[in-house]
From Swiss-Prot:
Keywords: Phosphoprotein. This is LysM and putative peptidoglycan-binding domain-containing protein 1. It comes from Macaca fascicularis (Crab-eating macaque). The keyword Phosphoprotein applies. Residues 98-107 have a biased composition (Acidic residues). Residues 108-127 have a biased composition (Basic and acidic residues). Residues 1-20, 95-150, 172-196 are annotated as: Disordered. InterPro entries: LYSM1-4, LysM_dom, LysM_dom_sf.
Length: 227
């Protein structure tokens, strides 16, 4: 007696009813997947390598090979452009649908200005009181803090240096003028006090070739040549 054919239960795992069975290792690109890739087109240059592109874009060499179906490092020069896979965050997948909810949550978390103002004023009063106790002076809100003097630009520094050099030159010239006007007469009286110095001043410097030592040496040489 033939047994009655069994009918598949509703919603079962049959071919027509229920979800479709998939084999091991099959890839499914689900719309709910938190990880998605966005591809950038990179124009290849003579010095480009897979390792350099991976470091530049923050991806692995295997991901670049998989996106462009490459097998070796030398095969990148067979193409003009390469696609670089870049991972996108899950927030970018919603296309701004949850942006309104996030904004509403931020508005609820943010305190109002009326609540923040008294706390800030109390904190400022405490800081000013502590500063006065320590002897420090805090500027008022309407009063601007003086700019530091030592912050000079390069041109200002060079101008200041030039002015200092000119002042030092003027001071040196004045000293030289004062020395020429008063000192020479006194020096002359001191140097010409001895008779020997007076003779030197009249006759001038005595050359070394006319000393007695040189005369005796010349006389000895003449006697040797005569012999």
């Amino acid at each position: 007696m033939a047994s009655p054919s069994r009918q598949p239960p509703p919603g079962g795992s049959g071919l027509l009813h229920g979800s479709r069975a998939r084999s091991y290792g099959s890839l499914v690109q689900s719309a709910c997947s938190p990880v998605r890739e966005r591809r950038l087109e990179h124009q290849l240059e003579p010095g480009d390598t897979l390792a350099g592109l991976a470091l530049k874009y923050g991806v692995t060499m295997e991901q670049i090979k998989r996106a462009n179906r490459l097998y070796t490092n030398d095969s990148i020069f067979l193409k003009k452009t390469l696609y670089i896979p870049i991972l996108t965050e899950p927030r970018d997948l919603f296309n701004g649908l949850d942006s309104e909810e996030e904004k509403d949550g931020e508005e609820e978390v943010r305190p109002s200005n009326d609540e923040v103002w008294p706390h800030s004023t109390e904190r400022k009063k405490q800081e000013t009181g502590a500063g006065r106790a320590n002897g420090e002076v805090f500027p008022t809100p309407g009063q601007e803090t003086p700019t530091p003097i030592h912050d000079l630009s390069a041109s200002d520094f060079l101008k200041k240096l030039d002015s200092q050099i000119s002042l030092s030159k003027k001071a040196a010239a004045q000293k030289l003028k004062k020395g020429e006007s008063g000192v020479p007469g006194e020096d002359a009286g001191l140097h010409l006090s001895s008779p020997r110095m007076q003779q030197r001043a009249v006759l001038g410097p005595v050359p070394l070739t006319r000393t007695s030592r040189t005369r005796t040496l010349r006389d000895q040489e003449d006697e040797i040549f005569k012999l």
